[in-house]
Amino acid sequence: MCALFGWLDYKGIVSDRLLKKLTQALANAAEERGTDASGIAYVKSGKVTVYKRPKPAHKIHFNAPNGTRAVMGHTRMTTQGNEKFNYNNHPFYGHADVNFAFAHNGVLYNDKELRTKRHLPNTQIETDSYVAVQLLEQQGKLNFDSLKNMAESVRGSFCFTALDENNTFYLVKGSNPMCLLHFAQLGLYIYASTESILKKALQKAGFHKYPFEVLHVDEGMILEIDRYGFLSGSTFEVQESFRFGKWYNWYDELEEEYYTQQEELLLEMCSCYGVTEEDVLLLLDYGYSADEIEEMLCDSNLLLETLCAVRCEEEFCCE
């Protein structure tokens, strides 16, 4: 699990001080999904700039220069590629018809296959996410068509963001969560991977006092927001993407269980939160979604209360 976060200011009426406070608040709140590395990207004097470090966000002072009109951020929980080598961390630089920065929340499992099949150049970057950047660079464009091609080529769980040198922001929504808000009065878009990140950050930075609209972003959507705040969209075909799990109930009937990529990642990473696979499977079987379980992992009290309630109900039903 990682987190994406950021904002785009298209009116220029929010003070630089408040926007810097918002950036840090978003980054700190996004630690709930990753503390191995943190980074942001922004445009300075017409050039894309990336600042990232192998540290949790609260130990980094994010200070985009005055006049910055968009910030794209990421907090990382390492799955592939050692975070101690900073080139493995997000955001990444990309070069097509425009220079851009790129970030990913999720896990891609066909990155090595794509590098061979598409004859992508060798790179020291070990992170699975970087293959998406290479696919865009190979096409030589950053637009709806190239993003669609990339999204339909990769396999795994994902939500991608990109920010180009013109302060145009792109969002590609796969199976991983994303929340996008529009503050029309302020001329400001703010986004983060989860609602809980946004709630914490808006409260901390004081933006909860202003009216906003929740923009629903569905799986298979590609959004573009330009520097004037104009939003346009396209779509891509969602690919079936799962792996097979364990065989069980051999004494009754051989049955094959499979999970979505987001559920698989929960099963892989749950031990980092002191939770067993059995606990996660119990919640999934009970009907909780992967997004709901992710929220619980970040709130240990809620998780323990829910597990206790589910177990008590199961024991009652078995009596």
What label would you give each PLM region?
Residues M1-E319:
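Conserved short alpha-helical segments that host acidic/polar catalytic motifs at enzyme active sites
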